Amino acid sequence: MMKQIQVDLGERSYPIYIGQNLMNDSEALSRYLFKKRILIVTNETVAPLYLNQIQEVMVSFGEVESVILPDGEQFKDLTHLDAIFTALLQRNYGRDSVLVALGGGVIGDMTGFAAACYQRGIDFIQIPTTLLSQVDSSVGGKTAVNHPLGKNMIGAFYQPQLVLIDTQCLHTLPAREFAAGMAEVIKYGIMWDGEFFQWLENNVQALKRLETEALVYAISRCCEIKADVVSQDETEQGVRALLNLGHTFGHAIEAEMGYGNWLHGEAVAAGTVLAAQTARSLGLIDESIVCRIVQLLQAFDLPVSAPESMDFDSFIQHMRRDKKVLGGQIRLVLPTGIGQADVFSQVTESTLEQVICCA
């Protein structure tokens, strides 16, 4: 059974298809690929698992080629972005071509950014293969590469034509990667939907066993929330900022520790706890809410504290470069309950120092 969710952006609206074995569903793909030149962008981990399978489906639509990049956040940079451009140019791809992102968040972000830039914009499709990319990065049109001084600092908003989520991919996903994806799933419950958070608390084992019904529901609910938020605020001028819960602290951890040493979801998990502790210190939530957040993250074997090697100065240096900074003020997304959050710009550095040093 396939579930469909629509991201409503007027002429740039697109569907999200969610279900089992969708990569074999030529009907789902045909509308977007028929008589097109197709370049699949994937990585060295995903290619042996799924590249031949998806090529066999797509070859009936048009000419299909691929470019295989190294796997890892540390390769999400301008050098490897250029490898996509080189493949497009060497093979004379035109504006009627389609890029297909087959992989996790790194591949999706880089492929989308390449699509946004190449000949001032060509179509692309997201086929996310990790839980994190299925519930978050593949939806909403954020595309980017990293810079040594900051994560996702070079990018664009550019929407895909289609997001195709095949839950079967999660059965080849390492346990650590699955857990990292759950950090983003849990985030949606904290910042938007308290009933979903409670459902997650009650379905930990079903999700860890990769039960199809539980996976489809969790992924669908996350995509519904993301689609709703993006439809209201595509370029993050308002409510979309709430999706960054845990990310200001989390991006600081990733940048300080070196991209790839902590998975993005692991950094978001620790960052979410720091955000909750900051909210508690400001009197926005009580200790019981912090405990529920910590316990749910721990149930999926996620880190709930920052690396011991990071001190306040390390955090603040990176947080001052965060994309949400306005007028020199660090802006934090903080929970104000289970199922609700807000953006705060008046959190003092002394408060942050107390939270970070006592965490």
Swiss-Prot record:
Tell me the pathway.
Metabolic intermediate biosynthesis; chorismate biosynthesis; chorismate from D-erythrose 4-phosphate and phosphoenolpyruvate: step 2/7
Q: Which Gene3D superfamilies match?
A: 3.40.50.1970, Dehydroquinate synthase-like - alpha domain (1.20.1090.10)
Describe how the cofactor binds: Binds 1 divalent metal cation per subunit. Can use either Co(2+) or Zn(2+).
| Known catalytic reactions | 7-phospho-2-dehydro-3-deoxy-D-arabino-heptonate = 3-dehydroquinate + phosphate
Cell compartment(s), UniProt: Cytoplasm
**Any idea which positions bind Zn(2+)?**
E184, H247, H264
List required co-factors: Co(2+); Zn(2+); NAD(+)
Q: Name one GO molecular function term.
A: 3-dehydroquinate synthase activity
Which processes are annotated in GO (biological process)?
amino acid biosynthetic process; aromatic amino acid family biosynthetic process; chorismate biosynthetic process
**Which Enzyme Commission numbers does its entry carry?**
4.2.3.4
The record's InterPro entries line, in alphabetical order, gives:
Dehydroquinate_synthase (IPR050071), DHQ_synth_AroB (IPR016037), DHQ_synth_fam (IPR030963), DHQS/DOIS_N (IPR030960), DHQS_C (IPR056179)
Q: Which GO terms describe its cellular component?
A: cytoplasm
Which UniProt key words apply to this protein?
Amino-acid biosynthesis, Aromatic amino acid biosynthesis, Cobalt, Cytoplasm, Lyase, Metal-binding, NAD, Nucleotide-binding, Zinc
Judging by the UniProt lineage, the source's domain of life is: Bacteria
Q: Which family does it belong to?
A: Belongs to the sugar phosphate cyclases superfamily. Dehydroquinate synthase family.
Function (record text):
Catalyzes the conversion of 3-deoxy-D-arabino-heptulosonate 7-phosphate (DAHP) to dehydroquinate (DHQ).
Query: Per UniProt, what is one Pfam family of this protein?
Result: DHQ_synthase
Quote the record's binding site residues for NAD(+). 71-76, 105-109, 129-130, 142, 151, 169-172
Q: What is this protein called?
A: 3-dehydroquinate synthase
